[in-house]
């Protein structure tokens, strides 16, 4: 029986590197392409001596050719700090990157999974968000480069499925956190933890009453691998995330308590188009993947705090 060859785009990033850690445990050959725009070689440096692992510096928006059995398409900056820095590049990564990987998958007969996002729901009017909800996204706002880029990538995946009968899987990833998030990541959990550990004011946008649900990285990786392994007929989209909702202010107070920080909270204006609520309906994932998150927010925060202590 031949060894499975797996390609992970964005494999040096936060979620991608954790996915690689899990995949390499099986009898596979693992190829990663990453341009290190937000990813870092240090995230996978412990794998580079493994003969089953190879990483190539490559931008997914440029064509790429190889022979693989499976593709996890994760490449794209996911934090507003990064994706708004070069919005044209962000859109190109999502759209042209999807086209390149879909054409590769179609050419070699590979199964391909798209790492989509809860951002396709925008600032939702339906709560919690089900996969059948079409979303409420501002197509011309400062977040559109990411939100609409991911929505277009989903469109391309389903068009390749309908037109070429390509084996696709689409996962909609909700807020995910854990070790290996960059200290300058810019997202809420990394911001709050880093500020708390430094003892500086913790920045809260708006009044802090906006809510999110946070999924620990190991649970997310379980979901992604589980979805890739499902039978051909299951294509998605499938929500992956934690259904336990918390406000940003509650999160900040929890981090202050866990870090024993003397930081105070500083309220600043809410960014444009920032969602007021974000929480997944995961009944579909529960049913078809037999999946649900196992790590509580407190336990996940403790692990993440310990990681940041080690790198600050």
Model-based region annotation:
Residues 19, 224-228, 252-255, 301-308:
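Hydrophobic "lid"/C-terminal helical patch
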Residues 125, 151, 167, 176-191, ...:
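Glycine/proline-rich active-site loop of Rossmann-fold NAD(P)-dependent oxidoreductases
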Residues 217, 237, 269-292, 303:
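Conserved C-terminal active-site "lid" loop/helix of NAD(P)H-dependent oxidoreductases
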Residues 53, 131-137, 164, 193-204, ...:
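A short C-terminal helix-loop "cap" of Rossmann-like NAD(P)-dependent dehydrogenase/epimerase domains
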Residues 1-176, 196, 218, 303, ...:
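N-terminal Rossmann-like NAD(P)+-binding domain of SDR-like oxidoreductases, especially those catalyzing
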Residues 69, 81, 88, 99, ...:
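Residues in well-ordered alpha-helical elements
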Residues 39, 85, 93-96, 144, ...:
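Residue-level signal for the nucleotide or nucleotide-sugar donor/cofactor binding architecture
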